[in-house]
From Swiss-Prot:
Protein location: Nucleus
Segments for region (Disordered): 28-138, 689-730
Keyword DNA damage part of the UniProt annotation: no
Positions with biased composition (Basic and acidic residues): 31-42, 55-85, 120-138, 689-728
EC annotation from Swiss-Prot or TrEMBL: 3.6.4.13
Species this protein is from: Saccharomyces cerevisiae (strain ATCC 204508 / S288c)
SMART domains, per database record: DEXDc (SM00487), HELICc (SM00490)
Location (main, coarse): nucleus
Protein name, entry field: Pre-mRNA-processing ATP-dependent RNA helicase PRP5
Domain free text: The Q motif is unique to and characteristic of the DEAD box family of RNA helicases and controls ATP binding and hydrolysis.
Phenotypic consequence of residue 293 to D: In PRP5-1; no growth at 37 degrees Celsius and impairs pre-spliceosome formation in vitro
Keyword tags: ATP-binding, Coiled coil, Helicase, Hydrolase, mRNA processing, mRNA splicing, Nucleotide-binding, Nucleus
Miscellaneous comment in the UniProt entry for this protein: Present with 358 molecules/cell in log phase SD medium.
Highest taxon in the source lineage: Eukaryota
């Protein structure tokens, strides 16, 4: 029995133990469940609170909107009020204290700003109760926000701050709400416009009283020159490469440096240090003309000494003027160049003449160089600035135009002027000229003289003298022209390598001969330049030549400026080196040792060929220019056939000469049919022949159709697909010139110029082009003149019946300068011609098939 009882007790205890464990587990699970429930409850409370806060915020936003609406109503009441709101305390004594209600609210999206806005109406000021015990809940809430955010309210004005400023000014008496809003909007618009606007130079109008007089004429004719008869002068000019003169009062040419009246130091520098012998043709005629104070247009081949022609008169004029004061930056002389390489070269020439004279300082301002150093040098004062147009515009617009003053500029030079216009610098040059005094002396040098440049010279220069050297052929006679016709790119590259190897073998033979002679014989230095048409071709040819064991100095605009400068210095320093470059250096690069120029890619214009071949045979040296032509480069063959002299063609291989003539004839025939045409560029000897032929054809057509209307004649020319592009050019030539009248009006002491350009009787397509919005906006932007349509169109045979009727259709151009009016008319004619030619081209394409 005891055993049974003991077993039962053990079972009970084990059962109780199991129940206790289950109870403990249940309590543990319950505790976890309670904890989770409590956590969920707290999360629900947070969500509830956030929703309540969101509702509170929405209510607050609604109150803000109501306050805004109330403010707008109050503003309108103030504006409609006949009497202005008094902002000063009333002079009448009142026993009741005036209480001002001030409503403060926040428009900002963040919590870092505070805006307080207060308005007081007339009724509030005069009829305010003595005590206002009622408190607006919104006032209390906003006041608390104001106290909390007071420390963060000292920032920049945002949208809400504008209202705060308005109220403060309103209470102080006297600023209208609209004025504040308008001023703020205008300031914002002005800032945006300033960021987006292009850099434009302000035109400066000088009165005669504020301009300091200066001397232009320094030339005294020597007895030897003055004793020459007119016949002797003609013979001398004929012997000096057939000098052609246009203009009146041109001085006689000189033949010796001593006839110019130069100082002893300058004579020693020219003859002994620089080793200049006799004068070149352009120097013989240009130096006396410029030293006489005349504006000069010099047209001469490259490498003919044009730099000295304007540099000596410039230095002489600068030294004769009053020195710069401490507060004057200068300059007195300005030289504009198309490329930084040419500008640096001119600056080096200036330095040669001024390094011994501390009274004349020169600064070179070009793109790609550090502007900080240029600004520092300009602030110290400088007498001469050599610059590219773009960088000079940048300097003129710095610090609102206060960095540099153009008031003292009396001498302006444009070197390689045709290249300046070819690169599109005409607007910049026009802006620069508007800042310079009108009585300046202006000199323009170029290798070619296209119509666009001629038009600019007429506007800017005063009674200029035009000096043309060797006008019948612009290619330097010291350049021996050759060519090779290839039938593939690989063959052309093989010819290039062969030419370089032949050149190296020739130098080796010459050097071996010199080694057998006296040791005093200098080593031959004959450099070569290879011109290509693009940056990619330049890099490709450079790598291929390097693989062939030929090292070159490669230069193009895609390389960093420092790398270009290092390669150029290496090319100048090393003997018999080879420069590989694009056409960017076809002008202005002066390396006298260059004896060979290889044109790897055929040039597209005659002017480009002139300047490319002009890199060799500098001065009195001789050189060779070899063009590598592909069999399908017909335009290059045409240019070569027109540029090469007869004796050069006779000396060629008969088969090569025959193939060149066939390619040239094929291109010329294609031009007549409209199949081919030369790229746009400056005209040369070959282009003049085309022009004369077109003029002859035009005269014949005019004789045959002299009784037809001009509009019918133009339509027939345009709609004739047989003549192709040649017809287009002829039709553009038949566009009638614009008839206009120029007037001058003086009102209130100010002078206004205006012109009436009559377009009613012009052909319909001309009227369309003249009155297009794009045309008018372009002219306004370029000249600053106002141009508007006036009158109405009258069909042919109809006229205004009386004075009360509107006049015939015309364009009214108004401006403050007569030159701007003339420029506007020229641009209008140019745009009309371009538009008509374009329309004619589209007509040809549409009727081709």
């Amino acid at each position: 029995m005891e055993t049974i009882d003991s077993k039962q007790n053990i079972n009970r205890e084990s059962l109780l133990e199991e129940r206790r464990k289950k109870l403990a587990k249940w309590k543990q699970k319950k505790a976890q469940f309670d904890a989770q429930k409590e956590h969920q409850t707290s999360r629900n409370d947070i969500v509830t609170n956030s929703l309540e806060g969101k509702q509170t915020t929405e209510k607050f936003t609604e109150r803000q909107e109501r306050v805004k609406e109330e403010l707008r109503k109050r503003k309108n009441e103030f504006r409609k009020s006949d009497e202005p709101v008094s902002v000063k305390p009333s002079k009448k004594k009142s026993k009741r204290s005036k209480v001002k209600k001030k409503i403060s609210f926040d428009f900002s999206d963040d919590d870092d700003s505070e805006i307080g806005v207060s308005f007081r109406s007339k009724e509030h000021i005069q009829k305010a109760p003595e005590h206002d015990n009622e408190k607006d809940p919104l006032d209390e809430f906003m006041t608390s926000l104001k106290e909390e955010k007071m420390s963060n309210s000292k920032g920049m004005y945002d949208r809400g701050d504008i209202l705060d400023v308005e109220d403060q000014l309103f209470e102080l008496g006297g600023t209208d709400d609209e004025d504040v809003e308008d001023n703020t909007d205008n300031s914002n618009i002005a800032k945006i416009a300033k960021l987006k606007a292009k850099k434009r130079v302000k035109q400066i109008y000088y009165s005669p009283e504020e301009l300091e007089p200066f001397q232009k004429n320094f030339y005294i004719e020597s007895e030897t020159v003055s004793s020459m008869s007119e016949m002797e002068v003609e013979e001398l000019r004929l012997s000096l490469d057939n000098i052609k003169i246009k203009g009146t009062g041109c001085p006689k040419p000189v033949t010796k440096w001593s006839q110019l009246g130069l100082s002893t130091d300058t004579m020693v520098l020219i003859t002994e240090k620089l080793h200049f012998g006799s004068l070149t043709p352009i120097q013989s005629q240009a130096l006396p003309a410029i030293m006489s104070g005349r504006d000069v247009i010099g047209i001469s081949k490259t490498g003919s000494g044009k730099t000295i022609s304007y540099l000596l008169p410039l230095l002489r004029q600068v030294k004769a003027q009053r020195p710069l004061s401490k507060h004057e930056t200068g300059p007195m002389g300005l030289i504009l160049a198309p490329t930084r390489e040419l500008a640096l070269q001119i600056h080096e020439e200036v330095t040669k003449f001024t390094e011994a004279d501390t009274s004349i300082r020169s600064v070179c301002c070009t793109g790609g160089s550090e502007m900080k150093k240029q600004i520092t040098d300009l602030k110290r004062g400088t007498e001469i600035v050599v610059a590219t147009p773009g960088r000079f515009i940048d300097i003129l617009t710095l610090n609102d135009g206060k960095l540099l003053s153009t008031k003292r500029i009396t001498f302006v030079v444009m070197d390689e002027a045709d290249r300046l216009f070819d690169l599109g610098f005409e607007p910049q040059i026009t802006q620069i000229m508007k800042t310079v005094r009108p009585d300046k002396q202006c000199v323009l040098f170029s290798a070619t003289f296209p119509n666009k440049l001629r038009s600019f010279a007429v506007r800017v220069l005063h009674s200029p003298i035009s000096i043309t050297i060797n006008s019948k052929g612009m290619v330097n006679e010291n350049v021996k022209q050759k060519f090779r016709i290839c039938h593939s790119e690989d063959e052309k590259f093989d010819n290039l390598v062969q030419l370089i190897h032949e050149r190296s073998e020739f130098f080796d033979e010459v050097q071996s001969e010199n080694d057998g002679q006296s040791s005093d014989v200098e080593e031959v230095d004959a450099k070569a330049i290879i011109f290509v048409s693009s940056q990619n071709i330049c890099d490709f040819i450079s790598k291929k030549l390097l693989n062939a064991g030929i090292v070159t100095c490669a230069i193009h605009a895609g390389k960093p400026y420092q790398e270009r400068l290092m390669n150029l210095e290496k090319f100048k320093r090393e003997k018999n080196s080879i420069l590989l470059c694009t056409e960017v250096l076809s002008r202005g690069l002066n390396v006298p040792e260059v004896s060979l120029v290889i044109i790897y890619n055929a040039v597209k214009t005659f002017a480009q060929y002139v300047h490319t071949t002009g890199r060799t045979a500098r001065g009195s040296r001789s050189g060779t220019a070899i063009t590598l032509l592909l069999h399908d480069e017909l335009s290059g063959a045409y240019i070569l056939s027109k540029a090469m002299r007869d004796e050069e063609i006779k000396a060629l291989d008969p088969l090569q000469a025959k193939e060149l003539q066939e390619m040239s004839a094929k291109f010329e025939s294609g031009m007549k049919k409209g199949k081919f045409r030369l790229s746009k560029g400056f005209g040369g000897k070959g282009l003049e022949n085309i022009k004369s032929k077109r003029e002859e054809a035009q005269n014949k057509d005019l004789e045959l159709k002299k009784n037809d209307k001009r509009s019918d004649d133009l339509e027939k020319k345009i709609s004739n697909p047989r003549e192709g592009h040649d017809s287009v050019s002829e039709s553009s030539a038949l566009i009638p010139r614009l008839n206009y009248e120029l007037f001058k009006e003086s009102t209130d002491g100010s002078i206004i110029f205006y012109a009436k350009v009559y377009i009613n009787d012009l052909p319909q397509i001309v009227r369309w082009e003249a009155t297009k919005n794009t045309t008018l906006l372009f002219i306004k932007h370029e000249t600053g003149c106002s141009i508007t349509n006036k009158g109405k169109f009258y069909p042919e045979g109809k006229e205004p019946k009386n004075e009360n009727d509107e006049p015939k259709l015309y364009l009214l151009i108004e401006g403050q300068d007569e030159k701007d009016i003339q420029l506007s008319i020229e641009l209008l004619e140019q745009k009309v011609k371009e538009g008509v030619v374009k329309a004619a081209s589209l007509s040809l394409k549409s009727t081709k098939y």
